[in-house]
Every structure is written in structure tokens, then in C-alpha cells.
Amino acid sequence: MIHFNKETFEKALAEGKLMMVDFWAEWCVPCQMLGPVIESLADRYEGRAVIGKINTDEEQALAMSFQITGIPTVIFFKDGKEIDRLEGVMPPDAFIQVLEKNL
């Protein structure tokens, strides 16, 4: 799993691959609950999708550019564009469904 900053995120986005990005913060209890799910999906989809995290406290401008109003928020990208978004703690199947639909 990749921990993105602005530069690494923009580089990955430009590659156009399917991406799943978790916008989170260390103090966020729901984010901590979702963390293991994101990590297991990163392992499961390695080589097929880019899965990573953006710490909203460290990358506030990036979070604002995607109008993140609550965390955790997971945004899916393909061909450099947002294709879907899930907010809050969701079961793994919710993320798997979006990933599989767009592979």
C-alpha cells in the first residue's frame, strides 16, 4: 500500500491506472477501523490496482481539492478521473464491488 503525498499522488494519477485512495487521519477512530480493510485490499489487488492512503492532516490542500468533508472517504480513480466515492466505514465487499467493476 502506498502512502501518497501530493507529488506521488499526481504521478500515480497521471498513469491512468485504477486507483483506490483512502483519505484519512491518525486521530480518526473510524479511519483506524478501516485501515486493516484497506491494507488487505492492497495485498489482494497488487498488480491490478493502485491502492493507497492520503493523510488529510499532512495533505490538507489535496484533500480540499477533492472536497473531502468527512473521513474516512475512499475515492476511486480511473484514467486520471474520479469514478466513484465511498464515505464512512464500509464492509470490504463495497470496495471490492467498485474495484471489480472497473478492472
Regions found by a protein language model. Give the residues of each.
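Non-catalytic, surface beta->alpha helical segment in thiol-disulfide oxidoreductase systems
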Residues: F76-L103
